[in-house]
Amino acid sequence: MSAPSGFPAPSAPPSYEETVGINVNYPHPYPVPQPGLRPDGKGMNPPQYSGQPMPTSTPVTVQTVYVQQPVVLFYDRPVQMSCPSCNQMIVTRLCYESGALTWLSCGGLFLLGCIAGCCLIPFCVDALKDVEHFCPNCNAHVGSYKRL
């Protein structure tokens, strides 16, 4: 069927931009992607915010201070020092423990043929034992002296 001769043929409706009043002659702010392709985000800058200025940070300098403690050498005698646990000036308390020299002396005496338990004499001699140093105030272990 054809349209009546007195009426014009209907045309396509106007586009959205024409209806709303958007000027289609202005260029788009971002490139228009082609059909079938996704924009990858390259070359697109985020919008600039106005109003508050960007805060400027001042560089912070950090200075490290090293406090070197005097080196305390532990021997088989009490040592005067500052306790690292209670920070008091102390003279260490000694405790003798069987160590490598004690056991080697015992083994050597055993190989030489000491009979009737004479090879156990090194366990009674403090001069052959290792020495542990303790704080007399807080009983903290502050050091040790190994004979071997």
UniProtKB/Swiss-Prot annotation:
Single Gene Ontology BP annotation: sexual reproduction
Keywords, alphabetical: Cell membrane, Cytoplasm, DNA-binding, Endosome, Golgi apparatus, Lysosome, Membrane, Metal-binding, Nucleus, Transcription, Transcription regulation, Zinc
Ranges for region Disordered: 35-56
InterPro entries given in the database record: LITAF (IPR006629), LITAF_fam (IPR037519)
Protein topology in the membrane: Peripheral membrane protein
GO MF assignments: cytokine activity; DNA binding; zinc ion binding
Main localisation: cytoplasm
UniProt domain LITAF: residue ranges: 62-147
Entry-linked Pfam families: zf-LITAF-like
Subcellular location as annotated: Cytoplasm; Nucleus; Lysosome membrane; Early endosome membrane
Residue spans crossing the bilayer: none
Region feature (Membrane-binding amphipathic helix): 103-123
Motif PPxY motif: chain residues: 13-16
Residue positions binding Zn(2+): C83, C86, C135, C138
Highest taxon in the source lineage: Eukaryota
Keyword Cell membrane: yes
GO cellular component, one term: Golgi membrane
Functional description taken from the UniProt entry: Plays a role in endosomal protein trafficking and in targeting proteins for lysosomal degradation. May also contribute to the regulation of gene expression in the nucleus. Binds DNA (in vitro) and may play a synergistic role in the nucleus in regulating the expression of numerous cytokines.
PANTHER family assigned: LIPOPOLYSACCHARIDE-INDUCED TUMOR NECROSIS FACTOR-ALPHA FACTOR (PTHR23292), LIPOPOLYSACCHARIDE-INDUCED TUMOR NECROSIS FACTOR-ALPHA FACTOR HOMOLOG (PTHR23292:SF46)
Family under the similarity heading: Belongs to the CDIP1/LITAF family.
Comment, domains: The LITAF domain is stabilized by a bound zinc ion. The LITAF domain contains an amphipathic helix that mediates interaction with lipid membranes.
Record-given protein name: Lipopolysaccharide-induced tumor necrosis factor-alpha factor homolog
Species whose genome carries this gene: Gallus gallus
Gene: LITAF
